[in-house]
């Protein structure tokens, strides 16, 4: 399943904070949204939340911006939608 992510840099914690429609808002402690460190951190946060391995998270678009498109494998679309519904 493909989801959109909005990265919020310079945060105190690394976490998913909310969802606006189908866009996840992810806080990261890194300063730059365009670094490999930030991209890997976003993948790690998303993988932990959805209960999949980091290798099952693919960054499809937005490697250098705040808006990223991520593909999640290893769970059905139904399971992912259920987890998305848990986010305020």
Predicted regions and their residues:
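The alpha-helix within a helix-turn-helix
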Residues: 47
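Contiguous, often N-terminal, cationic amphipathic patches that form binding interfaces
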Residues: 1-44, 52, 58-63, 68-88
């Amino acid at each position: 399943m493909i989801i959109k992510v909005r990265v919020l840099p310079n945060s105190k914690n690394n976490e998913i904070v909310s969802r606006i429609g189908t866009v996840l808002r992810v806080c990261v402690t890194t300063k730059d949204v365009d670094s490999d460190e930030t991209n890997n951190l976003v993948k790690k946060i998303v993988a932990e939340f959805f209960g999949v391995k980091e290798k099952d998270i693919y960054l499809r678009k937005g490697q250098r911006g705040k808006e990223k498109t991520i593909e999640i494998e290893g769970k059905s679309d139904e399971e992912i939608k259920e987890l998305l519904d848990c986010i305020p």
